[in-house]
Amino acid sequence: MKKGTVLNSEISSVISRLGHTDTLVVCDAGLPIPNSTARIDIALTQGVPSFMQVVDVVTREMQVEAAILATEIKQQNPQLHETLLTHLEQLQQHQGNTIKISYTTHEQFKKLTADSQAVIRSGECSPYANVILCAGVTF
């Protein structure tokens, strides 16, 4: 049995295959996922697992160099926005790099998900709880 951080075989596999600048999406239960993009659905019920639980576990194994959020999160979900920014700041310190944070409209965000390696669907049921994580390198 694997004893690393990520036990979910699909998530572990997609992280191990990421190359520099590849993207991985963690989303809430409501984000539409393009048919052309791999869907890793781990939602069990409303709120389980939460968006931040998934982000926390994924970023323990994934080297992140950038994150893209929908601009709407600032007004529509400020508490989660602040929690995510704090997490990314702590991740920067742990990784020893700067994580570039950028914003786009929710409509554009949905289009960008089509280019990601996979979308991990959480059970989160709060607005705009979505992030595109861009893979960095460990060297």
Swiss-Prot record:
GO molecular function: D-ribose pyranase activity; intramolecular lyase activity; monosaccharide binding
Pathway named in the protein's UniProt entry: Carbohydrate metabolism; D-ribose degradation; D-ribose 5-phosphate from beta-D-ribopyranose: step 1/2
Catalytic residues in the record: 20
Keyword Cell membrane: no
Keyword vocabulary terms for this entry: Carbohydrate metabolism, Cytoplasm, Isomerase
Binding site for substrate: 28, 106, 128-130
Pfam family, one: RbsD_FucU
Subcellular location: Cytoplasm
Catalytic activity: beta-D-ribopyranose = beta-D-ribofuranose
Main location: cytoplasm
EC number per UniProt: 5.4.99.62
Broad enzyme group: isomerase
Gene3D superfamilies in UniProt: RbsD-like domain
Cellular component GO terms held in the UniProt record: cytosol
Record note on quaternary structure: Homodecamer.
Similarity remark: Belongs to the RbsD / FucU family. RbsD subfamily.
Function per UniProt: Catalyzes the interconversion of beta-pyran and beta-furan forms of D-ribose.
Record's protein name: D-ribose pyranase
Protein's organism: Salmonella agona (strain SL483)
